Regions:
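A short SAM/SAH-binding and catalytic strip from SAM-dependent methyltransferases
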Residues: 71-83
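A short glycine-rich, Lys/Arg-flanked "PGG" loop and its adjoining helix->strand segment in the class I
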Residues: 86-97
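Short alpha-helix
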Residues: 122-137
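Core SAM-dependent methyltransferase catalytic element
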Residues: 139, 145-158
Length: 158
């Protein structure tokens, strides 16, 4: 991610903060957004000792951010977002010039996620479609690679 103490970072879909606990101490400002009050509360607990953290319980697409970010990332969250082009375009608009957007998308193409007592609707997409969304938002794809469970994109704002 190329983090340093001067960078501002946004995580879309911060969840319980499992990635944020490693990222937040490495940057100037860390902001995480998630729609789930339960997971935001867990993230608050997990990130309690880190001062430069802001957690937002809200929808990334409708929340009105008051700052721009040097790095925006999202790990396996976009499968929950139906309006992917809108989400990528919003992320691009929140980046500082030269800022990085890192996105991992799940290789699983199921339409639902079984959560035991309920099923959650998913909006899977292909790597090709995701690359198109990123480019249409005015970002340059620097890297694209696959892991066992995901395709990861690293893009940059001009």
């Amino acid at each position: 991610m190329q983090l340093d103490a001067g960078k501002s970072v946004l995580e879309i879909g911060v969840g319980t903060g499992r990635l944020a606990v490693r990222v937040a101490p490495l940057c100037k400002i860390f902001c995480g957004v998630d729609v789930s009050p339960k997971t935001i509360e867990r993230a608050r607990e997990n990130l309690a000792g880190i001062k430069q953290v802001a957690l937002i319980c809200g929808d990334f697409l409708t929340y009105e951010f008051t700052q721009h970010f040097d790095v925006i990332y999202s790990s396996l969250t976009f499968m929950h977002i139906a309006e992917k082009q809108k989400a990528v375009s919003k992320a691009a608009g929140l980046l500082t010039p030269g800022g990085r957007f890192i996105l991992s998308i799940d290789k699983n193409k199921s339409d639902y996620l079984d959560m035991g007592t309920r099923q959650v609707k998913l909006y899977p997409d292909t790597a090709d479609a995701t690359k198109t969304y990123i480019q249409a938002a005015g970002l340059t794809v620097l890297k694209q690679f696959k892991t066992e469970f995901a395709t990861i994109f690293v893009a940059q704002k001009k």
